[in-house]
Structure formats: structure tokens, C-alpha cells
Regions:
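Positively charged n-region of N-terminal signal peptides that target proteins for export
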Residues: 1-4
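Acidic, Ser/Thr/Pro
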Residues: 20-167
Length: 167
């Protein structure tokens, strides 16, 4: 019985640290140096949630979000936010020049969904770290050469920086 109690204590102490994301700009699974430089710049164009945008690669913007309860997202977020007191929004992107792998990188924490041809696009890889000014998360998606929507949810602030870059 003492052994089981000891195991329970060890799990209680160890599991929370295993679930934490790494800290530092060198902890991402792939280099985000260019995206970080872009997101920490002061001249990012600003767009409102719901905007349609065209893009040369890399595409970068600050998105003005709305309270999540007011966000008109094309599909329900794949993951429910931890709190309904967060922000969300979406932008519609013109078709990329060619199909391929694209990274969507955020300046702060938030959930990213991509919708293309009316369907959710599953991510192929993701990386995140805390303690890196300007960059918090990056997710890769295989996109067709057709328009798509990036929708964000669970964001704590009413603006977020976003970069879309090719692989």
C-alpha cells in the first residue's frame, strides 16, 4: 500500500512538468528565426477578423480579434478553448501559387484551424515554446492551390501576430 502511495506522489509531482512546453527560442522543433524577426517588427499591417487578404510569401499581419462568443468562425474549433472569455477570428487567404507545406506561426498562444474547400485541414506538425519574444507557436499544414481560411480561437488578447510561410 505504501508503494502505491509513493507512486501516486511521484506521478503527481512529475506529470505536470512533463506537460509543460519548453522554454526558449531554441526549443522549437524547427527554426522560426525569420518568423520571429517579422513578428517583432513594428510595421506589420493590421486586418480585422473576417478580412480577405492576398499574400506574397511570407505573409505577415496583426489580426484584430473579437470575443470568441462573437466570432463568426466557419467551423467549430477542433479544440474547445479553456475559457469562453478569450478571443477568436478568421481571415480568408487567396490561393497559394502552388500546393505544398505551409507554416502558420503565431506571436502568442492560440488554437489554429485551417479550412479549405469547406473542410478542416489536419495539421502535419506543430511546435511551441514559451519565453521567446514574438513567437509562441507554429503549425504546418499541407495546402492545395486554392483559397483557404485561417481561424483562431482561445487567444487571450484581442490582437495576434500571424505569419504564413512556405516550407
Amino acid at each position: 500500500m505504501r508503494f502505491i502511495s509513493l507512486i501516486s506522489v511521484v506521478y503527481a509531482l512529475v506529470l505536470p512538468t512533463l506537460a509543460q512546453e519548453p522554454v526558449g527560442c531554441d526549443k522549437f522543433r524547427w527554426s522560426l528565426d525569420k518568423e520571429r524577426a517579422t513578428l517583432t517588427g513594428t510595421d506589420l499591417p493590421k486586418v480585422a477578423s473576417g478580412s480577405e487578404v492576398k499574400w506574397p510569401l511570407p505573409f505577415a499581419t496583426m489580426i484584430a480579434l473579437v470575443p470568441l462568443v462573437d466570432a463568426k468562425l466557419p467551423i467549430a474549433p477542433e479544440r474547445s478553448p479553456k475559457s469562453q472569455d478569450t478571443f477568436g477570428g478568421s481571415i480568408q487567404i487567396a490561393a497559394p501559387a502552388k500546393a505544398g507545406t505551409y507554416k502558420i506561426t503565431l506571436s502568442s498562444a492560440g488554437w489554429i484551424d485551417v479550412v479549405q474547400d469547406g473542410q478542416r485541414v489536419r495539421s502535419t506538425a506543430a511546435t511551441g515554446a514559451t519565453g521567446c519574444e514574438g513567437v509562441r507557436k507554429s503549425v504546418k499544414f499541407e495546402l492545395a492551390a486554392s483559397p483557404f481560411t485561417v481561424q483562431l480561437s482561445g487567444v487571450e488578447a484581442n490582437t495576434i501576430g500571424l505569419v504564413i510561410s512556405g516550407e
